[in-house]
């Protein structure tokens, strides 16, 4: 089980609805929701992030495809899944991203798992790793020195998303399996800091 700091209320707020376009049953959260069915929602189909950054998951228990959610409105699934080839029309769990400190973020990426091979360092957003000179489309491991980062499968922040946090796994992501339950490949071609 991942140990994580409990956020204090006021810093994070999400308002959810069980139907698209802010219709149906409504509820506000300021902390983790491990399972929407346990909170009286079969699923969440639209939401508004009022404060903080959040990560939503396809399945209960923070499992499945993940989506980084920053301040704004998400009226339907296209708003949060964007250009993903994998259609996810609902969220079944979500939590705040407590370590998102946009101004002081640092990430080390490695060509191979267990922090081996060629190394790169980022402290700013990178819409295209290949354009930056990173050979190939795969990354083997990450060390998050500070902040929270979202890695995307393709350039331009498209495709599957993988959230990397400095306060999870002590910031160490030694293998693709640690990027999330849906991670199947080390294909990462763009990386950006999470906006708080």
From Swiss-Prot:
SUPFAM superfamilies recorded: gamma-Crystallin-like
GO molecular function: structural constituent of eye lens
Superkingdom as given in the UniProt entry: Eukaryota
Region (Connecting peptide) location: 99-104
Pfam family for this entry, one: Crystall
UniProt keyword annotations, A-Z: Eye lens protein, Repeat
Residues covered by the Beta/gamma crystallin 'Greek key' domain: 12-51, 52-98, 105-146, 147-195
BP terms from Gene Ontology: lens development in camera-type eye; visual perception
Region spans: N-terminal arm: 1-11
InterPro entries per the UniProt record, alphabetical: Beta/Gamma-Crystallin, Beta/gamma_crystallin, G_crystallin-like
Disulfide-bond pairs as recorded: none
Family classification: Belongs to the beta/gamma-crystallin family.
Entry comment, domain topic: Has a two-domain beta-structure, folded into four very similar Greek key motifs.
Physiological role: Crystallins are the dominant structural components of the vertebrate eye lens.
Assembly behavior: Homo/heterodimer, or complexes of higher-order. The structure of beta-crystallin oligomers seems to be stabilized through interactions between the N-terminal arms.
The name this protein goes by in its record: Beta-crystallin A4
Provenance organism: Gallus gallus
Name of encoding gene: CRYBA4
